[in-house]
Regions:
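Short hydrophobic signal-anchor/transmembrane segments that target glycosyltransferases
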Residues: 182-194
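Donor nucleotide-activated moiety binding/catalytic core segment of transferases
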Residues: 61-63, 201, 208-253
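Structural motif
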Residues: 1, 72-73, 96, 169, ...
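Charged active-site motifs of nucleotide-sugar-dependent glycosyltransferases
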Residues: 1, 165-170, 197-199
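A conserved nucleotide-sugar
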Residues: 191-204
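A nucleotide-sugar donor-handling region in carbohydrate enzymes
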Residues: 102-181
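Short, charged/polar "capping" segments at the starts of alpha-helices
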Residues: 39-46, 106-109, 178-181, 207-215
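Active-site and donor-binding regions of nucleotide-sugar-utilizing enzymes
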Residues: 5-30, 34-122
Length: 253
């Protein structure tokens, strides 16, 4: 049994990584409990197959020490701080604890991967995803590789007519960042230089809030806003399968 604890503090990023990891472990026939403290966020990116997966269970964090038995392995994603009753449960079951860290290409990942750590009376081990054979590597799903291989077909994919555009589309994903004005200005100049028009897909949540704030707009899901040669299209968040297709088929992300 592998138990993954996710604390959603970073839009869809934390939940997305944990979901991909859980799904990949299930593909290896591991039984996975994915505990998330924000089910509304994770529900927006799960695939239909996830809800039917007999190896994957997605639920809220347990509220009592004895409400779940954390056997075998516990993965703490991105320095998540767990309640004391969960640590007591871990100690009781003598589970292996892994601290999943953020993906980085920095050299320190080679040295820190698999290092032990001691906290709350529990020994845990750091797991650093990365790009060398001294790190934990990357989670790359088979379906993603197939889509990458068939990229030319994806370029023609219109996502059920959601994002029709005669030229090219760009996906814009951001957090609170005032540089969005600078990015749009440069994209406008680029579009004019190439004599092209671009559709920019902006997803609901923090990316849309950031855009509205810095452009003094009030866009919502389904709206389209014209900015010179750019057409800003607001989309609901899509599941990871469709998001992968969007990324692969887009002009730039």
């Amino acid at each position: 049994m592998i138990n993954i604890f996710c604390d959603v503090i970073d839009n869809f990023g934390d939940a997305g990584v944990c979901l991909r990891l859980g799904r990949d472990l299930c593909n290896k026939k591991e039984q996975v409990n994915l505990f998330c403290n924000d089910l509304e966020t994770i529900k927006k990116i799960i695939k239909k197959d996830d809800t039917k997966n007999q190896y994957l269970k997605i639920s809220l964090w347990p509220k009592k020490e004895n409400s779940v038995e954390l056997r075998d392995t516990v993965i703490q994603a991105f320095s998540v701080r767990l309640p004391e009753y969960i640590y007591s449960n871990i100690k009781k079951n003598k589970a292996l604890v892994i601290n999943l860290e953020y993906l980085t290409a920095e050299p320190f990942a080679d040295d820190c991967h698999k290092l032990p750590s001691y906290s709350d009376g529990i020994e845990s081990f750091f797991f650093f995803p990365g790009f060398t054979n001294k790190t934990g590597g990357l989670v790359i799903e088979d379906t993603f590789l197939k889509k990458l291989k068939n990229k030319n077909d994806l370029l023609k994919y219109q996502f059920k007519n959601k994002f029709i555009n005669k030229d090219s589309y760009i996906t814009l994903f951001s957090y609170e960042n005032q540089n969005v004005n600078y990015i749009l200005k440069n994209l406008t100049e680029f579009a004019e230089e190439k004599n092209k028009s671009f559709t920019i897909i902006v997803f609901e949540g923090k990316p849309l809030n950031n855009l509205n704030q810095h452009l003094n707009l009030n866009l919502s899901v389904g709206d389209t806003y014209k900015l010179d040669n750019l057409f800003i299209k607001v989309s609901p968040m899509v599941d990871q399968d469709e998001y992968d297709s969007l990324l692969i088929g887009s002009y730039i992300n």
